[in-house]
Amino acid sequence: GNVEGWLAPGTYDVTEKATPKDLVKQMVSRTVTQLKDLKVPKEDYHAVLTKASIIEREVNDSRYYGQVARVIENRLAQTNGETHGLLQMDSTVQYGLGRFGGIPNSTELADSNNAYNTYVHQGLPPGPIGSPSEEAIKAVLNPPAGSWLYFVTVNLETGETLFSSTSEEQKANTKKLDEYCKKNEEICNGGKKKSG
């Protein structure tokens, strides 16, 4: 099966005789041990790793992990409200496109053929989009209380992220990202300058 999300980050002692398969087993075993130590029920492993991996790809600053975990929980719970159970996470769309970083364009955000497109598919994507740290996993297991439904990283270099509970607040915060992107086209477009 797919080992995405199951390969625990860290340092491993490997013998000369160890095969790649041995190393993968060691990495997966460390993840399972970590989940057991955190008392995660086995049936929740996949969802916890998926959520934690999204958190890490969405924000590059661990001080925001808990708030992003809360946004994910609030969005998943709100199937009839403002967000209709859609996570709407750029990181999942980018993963489905085989990219890391940047911001998906409107065509990519509307593409229902991308199974990881959480702008069009409700709930969690099919699986983890990276191998999360223990800190991100802990954020999923114990998110802070809050009514946030939205967040936007307004500076892709520093990771500064703003959270909001309404679409109106989010629109105001998104304008700050737009201003940043006008000044930093290459960063916002995944290393490519837009022509024209």
Regions found by a protein language model. Give the residues of each.
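Bacterial extracytoplasmic/cell-wall-associated proteins, especially those involved in peptidoglycan
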Residues: 1-196
